[in-house]
Amino acid sequence: MAILKWKLQRSTVREVSIAEPTTYTPAQTTAPTVSACTTEDGVSAPPRKRARGPSTNNTLCVANIRSVDSTINNIVTDNYNKHQRRNNCHSAATPIVQLQGDSNCLKCFRYRLNDKYKHLFELASSTWHWASPEAPHKNAIVTLTYSSEEQRQQFLNSVKIPPTIRHKVGFMSLHLL
């Protein structure tokens, strides 16, 4: 009989207060009731969410504004050579190739490059995207760095880049902190 009473007591549903903590006194024998805002129909209304909108804090912090690249990025063509080269007299720029395309295709291609052509480049970035809504494309980008322009040219001559991946040649100044 005691087991039956215990099972009956455990199987009954009790109302619990969610909106505010309830304190019990030894004299209380009834279960606490739910206290929440109710509408005319007796349905409890959910709590109101915080209104989102533009920030009212319009403080503009301008400190230490300077160019990301501290060098002059002119491309110079001389009369004797028909190819374009960069004026690197005062910069620590490294030659790069940016690969653009579907992120999964770029990841697979980067894996193949690390497996077969590791000697033809220095570093390969992870896939990344421009985070602006005005970004010119939604494709992923992988950046490859080279120790010299000759190494980059050797890479471009010997590696077949898939037609689904576009590439751009350029320079990047790397200032390590």
Curated annotation (Swiss-Prot):
Residues 29-57 are annotated as: Disordered. Pfam families: PPV_E2_C. It is found in: Host nucleus. SUPFAM superfamilies: Viral DNA-binding domain. Keywords: Host nucleus. GO terms for cellular component: host cell nucleus. One of its GO terms (molecular function) is DNA-binding transcription factor activity. InterPro entries: E2/EBNA1_C_sf, Nucleotide-bd_a/b_plait_sf, Papillomavirus_E2_C. One of its GO terms (biological process) is regulation of DNA replication. Belongs to the papillomaviridae E8^E2C protein family. Plays a role in limiting the replication of viral DNA in keratinocytes. Recruits the host NCoR/SMRT complex to viral replication foci to mediate repression of both viral replication and transcription. This is Protein E8^E2C. It comes from Human papillomavirus 11.
